[in-house]
Amino acid sequence: MVQIPENPLILVDGSSYLYRAYHAFPPLTNSAGEPTGAMYGVLNMLRSLIMQYQPTHAAVVFDAKGKTFRDELFEHYKSHRPPMPDDLRAQIEPLHAMVKAMGLPLLAVSGVEADDVIGTLAREAEKVGRPVLISTGDKDMAQLVTPNITLINTMTNTILGPDEVVNKYGVPPELIIDFLALMGDSSDNIPGVPGVGEKTAQALLQGLGGLDTLYAEPEKIAGLTFRGAKTMAGKLAQNKDVAYLSYKLATIKTDVELELTCEQLEVQQPIADELLGLFKKYEFKRWTADVESGKWLQAKGAKPAAKPQETVVIDESPSEPAAALSYENYVTILDDVTLESWIEKLKKAPVFAFDTETDSLDNIAANLVGLSFAIEPGVAAYVPVAHDYLDAPDQISRQRALELLKPLLEDEKVRKVGQNLKYDRGVLQNYGIELRGIAFDTMLESYILNSVAGRHDMDSLSDRWLKHKTITFEDIAGKGKNQLTFNQIALEEAGRYAAEDADVTLQLHLKMWPELQQHKGPLNVFENIEMPLVPVLSRVERNGVKIDPAVLHKHSEEITLRLAELEKKAHDIAGEAFNLSSTKQLQTILFEKQGIKPLKKTPGGAPSTSEEVLEELALDYPLPKVILEYRGLAKLKSTYTDKLPLMINPKTGRVHTSYHQAVTATGRLSSTDPNLQNIPVRNEEGRRIRQAFIAPEDYLIVSADYSQIELRIMAHLSRDKGLLTAFAEGKDIHRATAAEVFGLPLDSVTGEQRRSAKAINFGLIYGMSAFGLSRQLNIPRKEAQKYMDLYFERYPGVLEYMERTRAQAKEQGYVETLEGRRLYLPDIKSSNAARRAGAERAAINAPMQGTAADIIKRAMIAVDAWLQAEQPRVRMIMQVHDELVFEVHKDDLDAVAKRIHQLMENCTRIDVPLLVEVGSGENWDQAH
């Protein structure tokens, strides 16, 4: 692995940072409507880099305005790129001012690109013996790498020295230009040689050498072993001019005339009064407070600035990154005395992080192999209890370790933090330990801060927040069929890995928690919804649900027969046999042999046979309709009727789904193994699957389902008098809407008119256009638009809400639920019209869907609290969409159903009544 020498010259590709930040961070604005997201992102990245390496010399280099020498060489150079978005352009000048106020030299040289300036400074520094660290995400910079010049990509925390360049690109740094010249570079519109891709370019360069050698000895190319080698010499000959033009375009200049030398790029102390003014103007409130309190952490060796300044610490960066993640203060505990000593330390800590190590991802089946703890950054311990490889040292027995730890783990007053603690709670339950004092979960902290900012697993969060690449499980256990389980891993490696998990978790919490505390709404959601939900979901998962395999087996046999009938029908329509599961064969049948006009194409250019396309084609052609039914049944068979019996846990005789709190953008729960959300709701096949979810003897399944909850939330949010009145009076909302839209008395509304009104009601929740409504109702677009216009005339509050929400989303970059959950919309200001329109639709729907998610989560918490206190033999067994499902003893049915109904309808207050429909039966279908 590359070691970064002390105090390197840091050269930052500012233009690369700018675009990356613009696309990676939410489109934030200040109260004046000025965009700030890219500025915030660049400063975040710069700050982390400078504070991690603390250089005495650095520069941030941007592209200058105007054309460069490459534009003169090739008129199409970068010509495919869209113009810089206005909201990004507006941030450049203030960003430059902030970079300078941070004390960092800033360069932009006309006629060349930032890469050329960086290349020149890097080579100059190398000549005088100074190590260089270039921060960039651009692959063409790899040509500059030497033993003294290293690249770092702060977005992925990847560091490239000469060996890493070879591993990544297949060629050494000195052949990167040749590599790009041959294969081209689509990001810069460098053409390359037609027909030469990455693999071919690697084969040519590895086999013979650079471009000059290839053209000097073309006869040797045919002797290489890659596919197409025999004709490659001819292709190269035909495109020699293009190859050498591409070579020139890809070459980074290292002889740009500069007014400054690398030794003059000294990092100065921040100019606090300038930073303060800029931070206040653009409303970087936390940074403003840091400047005012004098906490800006300067780089070591910084020279005094010409103006008075204060020092600022930005709390998202690790205070001592090198020490905090050095592993020096990690211990492996092998005896009772040391463990008891650590338990005392853990009791006294304001909060400690802990993690379990096991031999399975299934927490019910998992065996505990060890536990790790961290009490402060960089101070962590691992307690192995079941490593059983040959010559493994003696360890504290699992029984003894848990006996010592149980009082601590069950103490409600001792606050704990973890990453996905629901899993660890489940593991400990296998050994009779009820984990209490669950105060924080870093996965949920990240999710609540921004659900769409990226993945919320520990490795990703460590990269993003700590700029630290964690030890991965594959690093210590290997891959594939020979991968070890954790109990087989040597303690030296296992201890470091496990202790790091706890250490990183604690450090992540210390970084994210102050950020979360600054936002009242998200903090409320975290403290009062997501964290209390963790033990509730853990209980629901452990309860599981009883499945009748015989029902599923019979259903599967029937589906098999129906699939055979559909296959024959499809063959008859097509006039020949073909594989209905083969996309390629289906494309041939539909679009070539039947002559149907393709509606869409795949990214690869082939005609699409997606479900959406087939649904549209099915309106006019019989075969797509058959294919859709075949696909739907085949998926049900493979996902549910065949698979569910295999998921029955041999220990419990039940199926235990896993619920995920940190997956969807809106706050909805998702589930896997099995995915309960995808069981069809309104067709016979879905009903048949639900019939296999059964109650044990003397029990019944009880289903409690919120009725039309998102429409009710729409009424509350829009404050539309017509909708509020209809719900308050308990009217059939779809019939009431039809009466308003069509100008009829309620009792004159036909079934068809009610269906149209229902499509409008639910369509508007999801931002449906007139075109979408016309397709759904199979009516002309003008007629659909007329329906929508009539709707908005009758319910003007809904239109006002939609317009208001779109405007707020564009201004803030996010929308909120009633509880304060923030739902960020990165594409709300996208220059891509389709992506922008999608974000606008999401802006309308997200507050409703997110509020519905918050409501059912509050209901789960309220019902669970009652069950734990008063009804221990009632089990909550599933949560699906807006529905909670229970197992209730027959003797308790009436009282329990009534209380669940009350708790769910009153768990939150909105301006229309929440309506819960409760049913019961021997199986889920009967109860639903």
From Swiss-Prot:
Transferase found in the keyword field: yes
Organism of this sequence: Salmonella typhimurium (strain LT2 / SGSC1412 / ATCC 700720)
EC number(s) on file: 2.7.7.7
Pfam annotation, one family: DNA_pol_A
Catalytic activity as recorded in UniProt: DNA(n) + a 2'-deoxyribonucleoside 5'-triphosphate = DNA(n+1) + diphosphate
Subunit description: Single-chain monomer with multiple functions.
Protein name in UniProt: DNA polymerase I
Keywords (A to Z) from UniProt: DNA damage, DNA repair, DNA replication, DNA-binding, DNA-directed DNA polymerase, Exonuclease, Hydrolase, Nuclease, Nucleotidyltransferase, Transferase
Domain 5'-3' exonuclease: residue ranges: 1-323
One Gene Ontology biological process: double-strand break repair
